[in-house]
Regions:
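Juxtamembrane cytosolic amphipathic helices that cap and anchor the N-termini
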Residues: 77, 191-199
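Conserved MFS/SLC helix-loop-helix module at the cytosolic interface between two early adjacent transmembrane helices
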Residues: 40-78
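Short hydrophobic/small-residue motifs within alpha-helical transmembrane segments
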Residues: 33-36, 124-125
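Flexible cytoplasmic inter-helical loops of multi-pass small-molecule transporters
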Residues: 166-189
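Extracytoplasmic
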Residues: 1-24, 42-45, 130-131
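Intracellular juxtamembrane helix-capping segments at the cytosolic ends
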Residues: 94-108
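Hydrophobic core of transmembrane alpha-helices in multi-pass small-molecule transporters
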Residues: 79-95
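Helix-loop-helix hairpin linking two adjacent transmembrane segments in secondary transporters
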Residues: 119, 123-170
Length: 199
């Protein structure tokens, strides 16, 4: 999720502003608007994790993150910037964090706290390492090339990490056990309006 976090995207603030000729305020307005829109979209896309197998959903998130990174490398207007920030905030900060915590909560019955701590430790480590690493890359490459490198890293590395980390978890049996029971019992999910009214 680090690629969609503010600490990471902020590293590209200056080069993008200079190239597009926009002010700090204009960049901030675009960033805030795109972030709000992504959070609203997350409400709908996020709940879809209950409708699909976790492995398929994870690959969807990876593809979206890959496309977001690629789009960043082609920014040439404020419209492209808004779209790139929207997709990156949605796929990175939103869906990546959502998918990881949901997966652990669903499939880790023992040591769930340790597993959750491990993923947040990863984010803290990224907050320390990535700013230094990206600043170093700026000396060698353009910011567009850096984003292209990130896109390649995402599409090549993340699928391998997912497959290697979940190979010992029986995802299919767990998900097959849950879905038929719900269908047999004809359990109806509450709609958002009903939840709000009940509150």
């Amino acid at each position: 999720s680090s690629f969609g976090q503010s600490f990471f995207l902020g590293l590209f603030n200056a080069p993008i502003r200079n190239e597009l000729g926009i002010t700090h305020g204009e960049f901030g307005n675009i960033y805030a608007t795109a972030t709000i829109c992504s959070s609203l979209t997350l409400i709908w896309i996020g709940k879809k994790i209950d409708d699909y197998r976790i492995l398929n959903y994870s690959f969807f998130v990876i593809i979206l993150l890959f496309l977001s990174s690629l789009l960043f490398s082609f920014i040439n207007s404020v419209y492209f910037l808004a779209a790139a920030i929207f997709l990156m905030r949605l796929s990175g900060q939103g869906l990546m964090s959502h998918t990881s915590t949901t997966t652990i909560s669903r499939f880790f019955e023992k040591s769930r706290g340790k597993a959750l701590s491990a993923i947040w430790l990863g984010l803290s480590t990224a907050e320390f390492i990535l700013p230094v690493l990206i600043t170093y890359f700026f000396v060698i490459y353009s910011w567009r090339t850096v984003w292209q490198g990130i896109a390649v890293l995402i599409v090549l590395l993340l699928p391998f990490i997912i497959l290697s980390t979940i190979k010992s978890i029986k995802l299919d049996s767990r998900e097959e056990d849950i879905i038929p029971k719900n269908k047999k019992l004809k359990i109806r999910d509450w709609k958002r309006k009903e939840v709000i009214k009940d509150y």
